[in-house]
């Protein structure tokens, strides 16, 4: 397999830490928290190591974003749970963390003719309107992801549930492009 410099850019994960979470108390007691209920119903907590941001909702749902790996997302959630326990908020000790989305970047290392690719890959799974957006949008079923392909050969893979989904998508696309003689 060729090295396409696949890099995880963002992991979005969610969990349930309890119910009836007192966001006002968290806002008062954790100085770096952000809570503006008139603008948005969630409270923002940030972790420094690993670097991540978490939206905490009164319902107990937590959405963690900004991690560079699934493990970092889990570590960030653990830190959030610890922070909340320290100020007396009743939360689940080890909540189940579920990956919702992984965004990865990759580089095929060659310039691409997106017009030829749009025709070659078949228009049913492709959106390409260069006047609207410079990238070609390719929807894959297996793995179930959306890939943005740019003329520079760079790609963004989104919608995956594991790092493996990004790797499979990049390998599949590079193989399809090679088979079509477009790479």
From Swiss-Prot:
<feature type="repeat" description="1">
    <location>
        <begin position="8"/>
        <end position="84"/>
    </location>
</feature>
<dbReference type="InterPro" id="IPR012295">
    <property type="entry name" value="TBP_dom_sf"/>
</dbReference>
<dbReference type="InterPro" id="IPR000814">
    <property type="entry name" value="TBP"/>
</dbReference>
<keyword id="KW-0238">DNA-binding</keyword>
<dbReference type="Pfam" id="PF00352">
    <property type="entry name" value="TBP"/>
</dbReference>
<dbReference type="GO" id="GO:0003677">
    <property type="term" value="F:DNA binding"/>
</dbReference>
<protein>
    <recommendedName>
        <fullName>TATA-box-binding protein</fullName>
    </recommendedName>
</protein>
<comment type="function">
    <text>General factor that plays a role in the activation of archaeal genes transcribed by RNA polymerase. Binds specifically to the TATA box promoter element which lies close to the position of transcription initiation.</text>
</comment>
<dbReference type="InterPro" id="IPR033711">
    <property type="entry name" value="TBP_archaea"/>
</dbReference>
<dbReference type="GO" id="GO:0006352">
    <property type="term" value="P:DNA-templated transcription initiation"/>
</dbReference>
<keyword id="KW-0677">Repeat</keyword>
<keyword id="KW-0805">Transcription regulation</keyword>
<keyword id="KW-0804">Transcription</keyword>
<dbReference type="GO" id="GO:0003700">
    <property type="term" value="F:DNA-binding transcription factor activity"/>
</dbReference>
<comment type="similarity">
    <text>Belongs to the TBP family.</text>
</comment>
<dbReference type="InterPro" id="IPR030491">
    <property type="entry name" value="TBP_CS"/>
</dbReference>
<feature type="repeat" description="2">
    <location>
        <begin position="99"/>
        <end position="177"/>
    </location>
</feature>
């Amino acid at each position: 397999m060729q090295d396409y410099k696949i890099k995880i850019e963002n992991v979005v994960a969610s969990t349930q830490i309890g119910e009836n979470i007192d966001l006002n108390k968290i806002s008062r007691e954790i100085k770096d928290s952000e809570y503006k209920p008139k603008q948005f119903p969630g409270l923002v907590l940030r972790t420094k190591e690993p670097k991540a941001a978490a939206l905490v909702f009164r319902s107990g749902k937590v959405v963690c974003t900004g991690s560079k790996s699934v493990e970092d997302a889990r570590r960030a959630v653990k830190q959030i749970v610890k922070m909340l326990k320290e100020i007396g908020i009743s939360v689940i000790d080890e909540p189940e963390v579920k990956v919702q989305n992984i965004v990865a970047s990759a580089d095929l290392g060659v310039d691409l003719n997106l017009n030829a690719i749009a025709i070659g890959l078949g228009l049913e799974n492709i959106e390409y309107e260069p006047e609207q957006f410079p990238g070609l949008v390719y929807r894959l079923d297996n793995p179930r992801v959306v890939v943005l392909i740019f003329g520079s050969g760079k790609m963004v893979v989104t919608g995956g549930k594991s790092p493996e989904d990004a790797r499979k998508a990049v390998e599949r696309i590079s193989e399809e492009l090679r088979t079509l003689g477009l790479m």
